[in-house]
């Protein structure tokens, strides 16, 4: 190679520029420096480098917007207190400017865990220490940590129908699982015993999609099952439990547990907004040491900025006020959409199952159409429907079709038009009208 000075003069550039270029080539192994002799090029002729074509920019399909979307993960967005949330974000930047630059504790920031513990004490009768609470970006992440902690030798039980995603997460971790049928009182304990499962996942306060509330007699049977063998546990998913329109909240299993066997799970994605990927689990004291010893190397997956903001949103009372506001809104939505169905041709060919809780109900329609035909017709009519079978692994064809009507995201002024279009999907309604 020419000397640095010679090459600099030849290219009319500074010698420092050439020196930096030579140094980079030397670091990458293309040239070597020999004392008092200069730079020599390494023999790399045996390596052929093929020029790669520029990566094609593939268009990303935007999520389709429907005239009516009854999917279960939709909520009313226009009621979110954005101005309050924005103000708290600004205050978080001001108050916690130094903490925001530090590593987030693996369980989550203390302020949020303390706020959640206080909320659970006041609204769920749960006596929880902040050290028992683990914050994560979505329940899927937290379920993954539990599956990993329990290990492949542990068999899980899942309600049928129920939260199918838990089965998918179990499969991805290589954990075996069993589906357990439900009856009018919830998960059937005799079938759970027969399954040989070690850990059961269920939603006793508001089963999805049926809305069944597990009565105290069935709860006592469940506690008998879990207390019979030391390695058994219950994962209680309290999703959507805030929206109960009559009476007080349903007491969680965690609050009734005397043997430290219940793991409590909940999320803010339904009560606030889906984009706020903050969920939490409460570990019973007997599992806390095990989690800390085996899972503490995982970093917290939620930014401290969002955690501090949510902590203030809860501790200053905004969260509870928002829940009360949304309960009133969803109660009115439920009333309007049920009234619209009763006033439509659907009333003559359908039966409604609703439990005065959550943001959905079940609508069974007596039709000659198959579910596949209804799905196809609905999409053509710009409607996204949710079917009861979507939450069951049993794909056996039944008479008629059963819909899960999640009305949270249906705009109030569109309800009449939405039900009219839903009715038009079924030829039986057209004959009535």
Predicted regions and their residues:
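Conserved core of the PLP fold type I
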Residues: 99-230, 242, 248-260, 330, ...
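Catalytic cores of nucleotide-enabled group-transfer and carboxylate-activating enzymes in metabolic
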Residues: 251-252, 292, 310, 341
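N-terminal basic, amphipathic alpha-helical segments
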Residues: 1-92, 101, 286, 296-303, ...
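Active-site PLP attachment segment
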Residues: 36, 255-290
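Residue-level detector of anion-binding/catalytic polar loops
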Residues: 176, 232-233, 383-384
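Helix-loop "lid/cap" segments that line or gate small-molecule binding pockets
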Residues: 116, 280, 308-315
């Amino acid at each position: 190679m020419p000397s640095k000075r010679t090459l600099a003069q030849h290219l009319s550039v500074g010698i420092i520029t050439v020196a930096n270029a030579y140094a980079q080539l030397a670091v990458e192994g293309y040239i070597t420096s020999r004392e008092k002799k200069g730079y020599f090029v390494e023999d790399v002729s045996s390596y052929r480098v093929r020029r790669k074509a520029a990566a094609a920019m593939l268009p990303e399909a935007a999520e389709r917007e429907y005239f009516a979307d009854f999917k279960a993960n939709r909520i009313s967005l226009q009621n979110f207190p954005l101005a309050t949330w924005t103000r708290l974000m600004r205050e978080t930047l001001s108050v916690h400017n130094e903490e925001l630059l530090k590593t987030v504790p693996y369980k989550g920031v203390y302020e949020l865990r303390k706020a959640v513990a206080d909320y659970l004490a006041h609204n769920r009768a749960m006596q929880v220490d902040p050290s028992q609470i683990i914050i994560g970006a979505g329940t899927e992440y937290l379920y993954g940590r539990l599956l990993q902690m329990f290990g492949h030798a542990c068999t899980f039980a899942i309600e049928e129908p129920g939260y199918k995603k838990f089965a998918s997460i179990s499969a991805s971790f290589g954990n075996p699982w069993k589906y357990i049928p439900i009856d009018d009182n919830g998960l059937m304990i005799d079938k759970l015993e027969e399954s040989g499962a070690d850990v059961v996942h269920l939603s006793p306060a508001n089963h999805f999609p049926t809305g069944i509330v597990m009565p105290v007699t069935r709860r006592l049977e469940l506690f008998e099952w879990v207390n019979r063998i030391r390695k058994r546990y219950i994962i209680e998913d309290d999703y959507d439990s805030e929206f109960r329109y009559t009476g007080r909240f349903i007491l969680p299993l965690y609050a009734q547990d005397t043997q430290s066997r219940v793991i409590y799970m909940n999320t803010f994605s339904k009560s606030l907004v889906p984009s706020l990927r903050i969920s939490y689990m409460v570990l019973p004291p007997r599992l806390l040491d095990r989690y800390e010893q085996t899972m503490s190397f995982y970093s917290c997956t939620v930014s401290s900025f969002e955690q501090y903001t949510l902590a203030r949103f809860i501790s200053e009372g905004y969260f509870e006020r928002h829940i009360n506001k949304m309960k009133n809104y969803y109660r009115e939505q439920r009333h309007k959409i049920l009234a619209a169905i009763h006033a439509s041709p659907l009333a003559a060919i359908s039966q409604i199952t609703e439990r005065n809780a959550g943001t959905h109900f079940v609508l069974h329609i007596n039709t000659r159409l198959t579910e596949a035909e209804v799905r196809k017709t609905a999409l053509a009519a710009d409607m996204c429907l949710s079917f009861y079978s979507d939450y069951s692994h049993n794909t056996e064809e039944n008479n008629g079709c059963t819909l899960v009507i999640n009305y949270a995201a249906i705009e109030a002024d569109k309800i009449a038009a939405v039900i009219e279009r839903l009715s038009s999907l079924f030829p039986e309604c057209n004959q009535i009208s």
